[in-house]
Swiss-Prot record:
Main function: Antenna complexes are light-harvesting systems, which transfer the excitation energy to the reaction centers.
Positions with a binding annotation for a bacteriochlorophyll: H31
Family according to the record: Belongs to the antenna complex alpha subunit family.
Transmembrane stretches, start-end: 15-35
Organism: Halorhodospira halophila (strain DSM 244 / SL1) (Ectothiorhodospira halophila (strain DSM 244 / SL1))
Protein name: Light-harvesting protein B800/850/890 alpha-3 chain
Assembly with partners or alone: The core complex is formed by different alpha and beta chains, binding bacteriochlorophyll molecules, and arranged most probably in tetrameric structures disposed around the reaction center. The non-pigmented gamma chains may constitute additional components.
Keyword line: Antenna complex, Bacteriochlorophyll, Cell inner membrane, Cell membrane, Chlorophyll, Chromophore, Light-harvesting polypeptide, Magnesium, Membrane, Metal-binding, Transmembrane, Transmembrane helix
Gene Ontology terms, MF aspect: bacteriochlorophyll binding; electron transporter, transferring electrons within the cyclic electron transport pathway of photosynthesis activity; metal ion binding
Subcellular location: Cell inner membrane
Length: 49
């Protein structure tokens, strides 16, 4: 892993929650974009497929 030295600059107790938070934020943004920009996904999500 060539990015292993990042943990010499950022503590894992700060970096890991930050990384997971960014992943969560991106996932929520993608789901929100799909919900607002498609017509079939909200119907499927409500169980009316």
């Amino acid at each position: 892993m060539n990015q292993a030295r990042i943990w010499l600059v950022v503590k894992p107790s700060v970096g890991l929650p930050l990384l997971l938070g960014v992943v969560l934020l991106i996932a929520l943004l993608v789901h929100g974009a799909i919900l607002t920009n498609t017509s079939w996904y909200p119907t499927y999500f409500e169980g009316n497929w």
